[in-house]
Amino acid sequence: MAKLSLFERRRRRVRTALKARSGGRPRLSVHRSGRHIYAQIIDDAAGRTLAAASTLVKGDKSIGANVDAAAKVGAEIAEKAKAAGITTVVFDRGGFLFHGRVKALADAAREGGLEF
C-alpha cells in the first residue's frame, strides 16, 4: 500500500509547482467538502489571509455544495479581492480536479476581474 494517497500526492505536486511559478503573487486557495466550498486569497510571504469567502452563511439554507453556490463564492472572492487591491493571483486547486465546483469557482472569479 502506498504511503501517500493519490489525493495527497496530487496536492503536493500542485503545491510545489505553484511555489515555482508564483513569483510573489498571492494565491487563491480552494477547498471543497461534501457540504461547502471555501476560497481564500493568501499572501505566503507574510503568512496572512487577505480575503476569504465560502458557502458558510448563517441562516441561508439554500446555498450548499453545488456548482451555482461555487460560482457565487467565486464572484464574492473576486469582489473582496478588488476591494483589497488584488488583481492577479495564482490559482491553487489544492489537489482537487479542475472540474465541476472548482472550475465554476475559478470561472466566476475570472469573470469578476481576477487574473490567473
Curated annotation (Swiss-Prot):
Keywords: Ribonucleoprotein, Ribosomal protein, RNA-binding, rRNA-binding. GO terms for molecular function: 5S rRNA binding; structural constituent of ribosome. It comes from the Bacteria. SUPFAM superfamilies: Translational machinery components (SSF53137). GO terms for cellular component: cytoplasm; ribonucleoprotein complex; ribosome. GO terms for biological process: translation. Belongs to the universal ribosomal protein uL18 family. HAMAP family: Ribosomal_uL18_B (MF_01337_B). This is one of the proteins that bind and probably mediate the attachment of the 5S RNA into the large ribosomal subunit, where it forms part of the central protuberance. NCBIfam families: L18_bact. Part of the 50S ribosomal subunit; part of the 5S rRNA/L5/L18/L25 subcomplex. Contacts the 5S and 23S rRNAs. This is Large ribosomal subunit protein uL18. It comes from Novosphingobium aromaticivorans (strain ATCC 700278 / DSM 12444 / CCUG 56034 / CIP 105152 / NBRC 16084 / F199).
